[in-house]
Amino acid sequence: MTEKTDLDEVVEIQTAVTNIKDEESFGEIIKTILFALGIALVLRIFVFQPFNIPSESMRPGLLVGDYLFVSKWDYGYSRASIPFEPPIIKNRIFSQPLRRGDVVVFKHPRDTKTDYIKRVIGLPGDRIQVIGGQVVINGVPVPRIALSPSMITDNFGNTMSTNRWQETLPNGKTYMVYDFYEAAPKDNTDVYVVPAGNYFMMGDNRDNSTDSRFDPVLENGVGFVPEANIVGKARIVLLSWDERAKLHKPWTWFTALRYNRLAHSIN
């Protein structure tokens, strides 16, 4: 049996110290990762949530390929605004009412896995109707100004003309809407009476939006949106890419970037 020399003992000690340092370094890395994930989760729950625009229902204000930040604090918090929808909140906490004209993200009333983004048109107790394409709130037509028609190109490359209107809600909120067709299916509706604790939502692209005008059962629409389903308020377009952007073609991340929409505030 070979006896250990002083040098062997020194080497063993150094090796043990190195292993301890490696374990400590690995532990610090894990702690840093967990801390970063915790901060990200807290921010997503209480501050901002990212969201992307999948359809053209909110044109002209929001485009397919827009990536938004949705603020969580404006209306308080509910199951819908927390990841995985834990059943710890029955309705909302720190609740604040939505305002007419706000652009909000919400969970579909019949499919809480699906997020929608629309504009708030009707508040609880309101009577909403559409007559000849013009919104009527509590018997009063929403003032609108005809703008010059616009030639637009959709995501399939089709170019067409659309009428544009500038609407002004009773609280003074002004925004632009598209109206493609003179007699679209929901250009004339019955009166909708918004129940307590619910809101009436519409897309700005009026003839290409499945919203509160459509019955959730009979027409596969949205219907009234309960306040518990509100996720947050759309605040800012952080980034935006057009249809040329491809994940597997990194150069298109720059050539397809809509530079004029970077950090673009949402009206």
Question: Could you describe each region identified by the protein language model?
Answer:
Residues 31-48:
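Hydrophobic membrane-insertion alpha-helices, especially the h-region
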Residues 56:
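Acidic/histidine-enriched ion/cofactor-binding microenvironments in catalytic or ligand-binding pockets
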